[in-house]
């Protein structure tokens, strides 16, 4: 019985170590920047109405700022947004529709 308890404890420990390794390796990987957003810095400032606005990222990029929402006059980094492929279909009227 003691051997069975030891085996269960060993399996639980190995499982916990494996899960911990999976989560820690995922957190250490950074987001890859590429294309038009690479090496681009964006800014959050106040406009003439006192509203916080972001600027500086090209079209198709997202400005990510690692500061609280209440902070203004801070810099961020531009990241490429994921694109999606959309398909459109068009139909031509048949001879039956025209009559």
From Swiss-Prot:
Tissue spec. comment: Expressed in salivary glands.
Disulfide bonds: 37-61, 42-63, 57-78
Highest taxon, organism lineage: Eukaryota
Keyword Kinase: no
The UniProt record lists the keyword Signal: yes
Signal peptide feature range: 1-24
Entry GO MF terms: toxin activity
Keyword list, A-Z: Complement system impairing toxin, Disulfide bond, Secreted, Signal, Toxin
CDD domains, A to Z: C5_RaCI-like (cd22951)
UniProt subcellular location: Secreted
Record family assignment: Belongs to the RaCI family.
Protein's name in the database: Complement inhibitor RaCI7
Organism: Dermacentor andersoni
């Amino acid at each position: 019985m003691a051997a069975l308890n030891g085996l269960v404890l060993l399996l639980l420990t190995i499982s916990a170590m494996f899960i911990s390794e999976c989560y820690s390796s995922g957190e250490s990987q950074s987001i890859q920047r590429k294309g038009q957003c690479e090496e681009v810095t964006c800014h959050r400032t106040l406009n003439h109405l006192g509203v916080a606005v972001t600027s500086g990222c090209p079209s198709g990029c997202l400005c990510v700022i690692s500061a609280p929402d209440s902070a203004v006059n801070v810099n961020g980094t531009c990241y490429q947004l994921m694109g999606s492929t959309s398909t459109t279909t068009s139909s031509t009227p048949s001879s039956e529709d025209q009559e």
